[in-house]
């Protein structure tokens, strides 16, 4: 893979490489299989402008929707969400590397790496045609804030200007972090002084329309997750960032707005080099739970934003 990344660095335009279903072969929490933290760090070290992230929500999540009399063509483990049935399951439809607060994703962000998440259908064969997949965009979506050009989309993916969502829980998300002088959004870095008062503004759309399942899920809560950036770590297998946690939970009752258009504000203080990211769900679960076999994917929906960084300056 490193040879391939070195070759790709010479291409014009350069591609974007995303690690797919990174924990499908993991046997336990933080006991990884074919894809390890060390391997993903090597990719990012070799080509930080190409190997920029991983699949947060894997595809293959429609197996449970197949007709009961049409299940003999696949082994039982395939019917877990994401086909994660041979080891550690998905959590709210997301890979453990993304879903666990203070886990691998936060370890990468805590090193200051610009390491982003995406979601896709991995659509081989639709579940109505004998497969276990949704059509592209039917269930999982990656929203990219970009000019509608090939170059613009690749540039924004490299820069982390993306959020991911399942089941059309939300259809728009804007994040602005400001110290009163400078404002930044996803993937960007706010350079500010120690002790600066910061304002985080979240604009979100919870659509008043049905998704592909004919349902209209309600966004129940948004979580603000923050962690410290402490720099590169010697342990290349590190998959934890103990500084990361949920610092605020905003319930639907506290949303300001009408007709599904909501604005949420939070006041913060710049006290450490760090980052913040958002997560939301239609469930009452404080954290995404391990997905059991037989779960209806449309009932357990989440969104995740990519992070905004804070860098303290003199």
Show where each model-derived region lies.
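Extended substrate/RNA-proximal surfaces in nucleic-acid metabolism proteins
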Residues: 1-74
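Catalytic pocket-lining loop regions of alpha/beta-barrel enzymes
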Residues: 41, 52-54, 81-82, 86-88, ...
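C-terminal functional module detector
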Residues: 8-15, 89-96, 101-314
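A solvent-exposed, charged loop/short amphipathic helix patch at secondary-structure junctions
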Residues: 68-91
